[in-house]
């Protein structure tokens, strides 16, 4: 196996990523080395590269947390995988597994977690290290490029929909029909929910209808809230906000039903006003949701494996990463962008077929 690999490296916040040769990492105890076949590009990667959030990654680092690939090597003590197994590497690299959150199945809020492509190097590279207990098993025959977005956009929206506690036959409103929103619509429909989509762009509203939304509403319309209340018979039982827009957060509280739940995923800067009287009187629950647990990830992958969820993707080589970031900033990306490595994502996985030479 090669000793060096190509990677897109952040050396300065807010500056273009540098494509360079770096050493192939060596898996330690309990770790696996994954040969990256495809890696999705997420807004979180852009935030990481820009240094937007209060706790910043340590420079230099390699972003990327929607990794689909095959096991290339095993670290000491790993017995659950073998070379050539198709695996996914998601945002949650590992967690302590000892705190009250981990012990109750909430490793996503562990204060000692590490995150792929943020606090440890990610998948904008030919190889990446994964903690074996947190690597997701992918189905044999998987399309690597197609499954990559499920490892973040998929599990994030699936978990957030579960957090609304909406039941089959009830309504959810999904605000923001971009890379996350169009996937969320498909999960919602697969879960037996009716969907009202909210966005400000005509092309995104068209995407929402194509994905299965029963109604699609322009958020800027003076009648937007009234239209949703009427269509849903009094408001959505759950509202999922993926939009990176504070006004979308405020609008969500106006379209949710009494005793409904608003699940927040988007991470715009700043704050949003909360109508305390309405929240109290109508018993509205406002809940943040961050990615998903290992169980959530397995469930999200299962929906996709059954063909019930399929992200709209466009593929590009690693060398295009700075152009992709520029398009993300400008809001010019419809669906999800996925980096492919040496066209490897076009090869379907078979047992042993993709093991390293």
Where are the regions that the model predicts?
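C-terminal hydrophobic helical "lid"/dimerization subdomain
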Residues: 2-5, 250-254, 294-357
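NAD(P)H dinucleotide-binding glycine-rich loop of Rossmann-like/cofactor-binding domains
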Residues: 56, 94-175
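Glycine-rich beta-strand-centered segment in the early N-terminal region that forms part
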Residues: 23-39, 52-100, 139-142
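Glycine-rich cofactor phosphate-binding loops and adjacent beta1-alpha1 units
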Residues: 164, 168, 200-202, 206-285, ...
